[in-house]
Amino acid sequence: RRRRKPGPPGVPHPARPALRADWLPLLAVLLIQGALSYHLILSNTAFIDEGTYIYAGYQEIAHLRHGTPVSTYETFFSGSPLIYPVVVAVADFLGGLNGARLLSLAFMLSATVAVHLATRRLHGSLAAFCAAVAFVALGPTQFLGGLATYDAMALAILAWSGYFAVRLTTGGGYPSLVASGLLLALAGATKYAALLWVPVVAGIAVLAGPRGSLRLWEAWRRGLLVLLTFVVAVGAAALAAGEKYVNGFNHTTLKRAPGHDSYSYVASEAARWVGPLLVVALAGVLVQLVRARRRGGAAWPEFWLALLLLLAGLMAPVNQIRIHTWLSLQKHVDFGAWFSCIVVGLVLARTVLWLKGRLHLVAGVAAAALVVGPLAWVGSAQGREMYGEWSNSKEFVAALEPYIVKGEDRYLVENYNVPAYYLRKQTNWQQWHDLVAVFRRDPATGEMQNGVPAIQAGIQAHEWKVVVLDFTQTGAIDKAIQPTLKAAGYRVVTVVTSGKHGRYTVYVAPGYDKRP
């Protein structure tokens, strides 16, 4: 066994427990997490976001390899199209949709390892185990482990940035500092929403460990250096990426248009997913406050750190309450929950040890189980619920496939990304269009049309060979163009029903039929 390099003077290394006492329990947690998410992976076809990102990744790879045209994803994606979409397209090429989803599972498993390691360095093995269990018990954690989107990758990178910030304060040196800052920048580039937790990671570098303090320059220096590394990396990336990426960041994140969901609805949804966890974290913060008031000194940074980690769990709900939208909230809350699980691990571990000293170890374990058990039960049900929110598209894609052929024909399909993903080998991306932001120049007058008038004019000219309506996200547009389809001679070739909400009506233009 190699000897460990000494850390900075006066900063003790955390004790390393025996393998069986530390890693085998974590392995059991990871196996349970893998089983819960893998069950979801097999239960449904591609979600629209999955189809979008994987399909975009194939286009980006073709553009990088052969210079083929590619859509301007950087202007409307909420993360760089050259990071996750490219990575997930490779996974999809190797293992199909399940391979892409297993990549997300690997990322989420690594996030669990990161919360275990970070908590172990701060509070010991028992707290680390409890933190990992709490994180795995969450429905959003299980959901992201089976969903091929930006979120799992960005969360995992953010988690390891947080771990290296902890490591920096507990015996790590400049490599930990650089790793924390660079990973923080990479997480933000992977999914822009991850930037919300930049202050949290910097705060960990200030407050964590035996030399954490709000009064010492050394502590502030650590946080500032992490931020400096982050800023340099992000600045260099922004300069290299160009104006389109900056505009895309502003459009999707910084200046995102507000939604129409009420404060109470967004708050209630967030409470449903992570509310119980945050209540336990709040209890941990209050315990730390009492402890700090009694002991003073070094106990105060521990309280401020616990408070920071609790606030991290509130950041996503507060931000989305601010912009009146619950869209993607079930994914975003898991980013902050990762940090809050460190406090939850601490309070559960102290509960176990307190009851062990006064009653019996069994009492302590039972108390922890009474907290984690309901979390896991509810979380498992929530994971299944989230995974069932979209319709199974297998029958729809099979019904549409005979009418789709690579060439110049154009297809107007509501939420087209899923069929475009499954039928990518027999179409070009330019052939697909959804019912949002349709623009058309009138060939007779040269006038630019947009929205419903543009769609109706295109239908009257039979420019769309296939039109698919499902009366969900663009229901008003669907109803407005339905009479135009009938008047222009389009015929309904099939209606496919899928699940509770999926009902796809497939129209084809006059004279257009199945491919030979």
Region annotations inferred by a language model:
Residues Y38-I48, L64-P85, L94-L97, E269:
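Membrane-proximal lumenal/periplasmic loop motifs of glycosylation machinery
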Residues L122, L126, S161-L177, A187, ...:
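Membrane-interface transmembrane helices that cradle and orient dolichyl/undecaprenyl
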Residues L186, V198-G296, P301, A316-L327, ...:
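Transmembrane-lumen/periplasm boundary regions of multi-pass, lipid-linked membrane glycan transferases
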